[in-house]
Amino acid sequence: MTIEMIVSKERVMKKILSSLPAKLLLGIVVGIILGLIVPESVMTVLVPIKNILNQVISFVVPLIVIGFIAPSITKLGGNASKMLGIALVIAYTSSVLAAFMSMGAGYAIIPNLTFGEATELRELPADVFGLAIPQIMPVMSALAFSVMIGLAAVWTKAKVVTNLLQEFQNIVLELVNKIVIPILPIYIALTFSTLAYEGTITKQLPIFLIAVVIVIVGHYIWLAVLYITAGLYSGKSFMEVLKHYGPAYITAIGTMSSAATLSVALKCAQKSKVLRDDMVEFGVPLFANIHLCGSVLTETFFVMIVSKVLYGELPSVGTMLIFCILLGIFAVGAPGVPGGTVMASLGLIVGILGFDGAGTALMLAIFAIQDSFGTACNVTGDGALTLMLTGYAEKHNIEKQKISVDL
């Protein structure tokens, strides 16, 4: 009996250590250690490898979007247009309300905070290899294509196209399982090695540590609001969804991209017993591109901090209201790109808030410090919204589609 218990424990430990979350955590630790101790000559080798892996993952992202959203729309049949509209409404509502919550916290907390001047970062070695693998189309083009081709196939009852999309989904699944998942831990390790090397972790983080902690707490508060709301609306246990999202959360911390984390998020959502398979395949890829509550919440709080630090005052309430409402729309142009929310909304930051070059540079720097946690909030929040979709489908007697995908 004792031998059996020992063997059983060994199997459990082996399973845990070989799991994706364990590999990702190991990658983070190894990456930080490497970044702190290796010389520039080693980083000259690591930077190109990181960029190549990033190119590979980025190339697959539009394929994942097309491979899941388009077939899911065809499987929803006549209910596709309705479910798409509902998904858009709840995603934008979540992002904008998260921004409003962050704005309120900013007016209450920021006047009592004091920040020093930022420290310059160590420059990374140039990518001497410079390999570029352009995506077959931008992520937003893939999203638009998926929605249009899926709806058109439903409206015209195009059986050949529907079958073709299903075959394409199977192909994409193999790409994810055979290529993306295996290289993720390596990519995450290299990402954190570059962050540690340039000093983002050791120099910039202490300066804005209080602000970052406040924002992360805000993420958890908003996730609690989303999941409790989803549980009450659907009448199902939200913990049955949330408990499976650990790997997706960790992956998002490493990739800093909702779209790049999509494959892992799908695996997590598929494990939940309360989420409908058709809603998972439709909602999770869609929300990865349009639901950026964590990033929006973060950016709202940080623009207020930067305004206070550099310009001596907070933006007016009216200005911030306009900024929050528009930010939820502009952020949709940023999926799949680390730090993309800020990049996509630079026009708002400059045009509405009046930031100059120093303001935008500082904004980009401090946003990058917590970019991974904002992305993790985005991805985890998608599970709550998918639970809402499941609840809506069941309350309105939308027939469950037969979808069988091995994730």
Explain the meaning of each model-derived region.
Residues 14-39, 51-60, 82-240, 399-407:
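Signature of multi-pass transmembrane helix bundles
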Residues 39, 74-82, 154-159, 167, ...:
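Juxtamembrane helix-boundary/capping and inter-helix hinge elements in multi-pass membrane proteins
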Residues 47-58, 163-178, 243-251, 267, ...:
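Short amphipathic alpha-helical coupling elements at transmembrane boundaries
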Residues 64, 183, 257-265, 296-301, ...:
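Transmembrane helix boundary and interhelical junction motifs in multipass membrane proteins
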Residues 81-87, 174-181, 274-288, 314-318, ...:
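Membrane-interface alpha-helices at helix entry/exit sites of multi-pass transporters
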Residues 114, 301-407:
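Transmembrane alpha-helical segments and their short flanking loops
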Residues 228-287, 309-315:
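Membrane-embedded helical hairpins/re-entrant loop segments and their flanking transmembrane helices
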Residues 247-256, 287-293, 325-338, 371:
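Transmembrane alpha-helix interface/packing and boundary motifs in multi-pass membrane proteins
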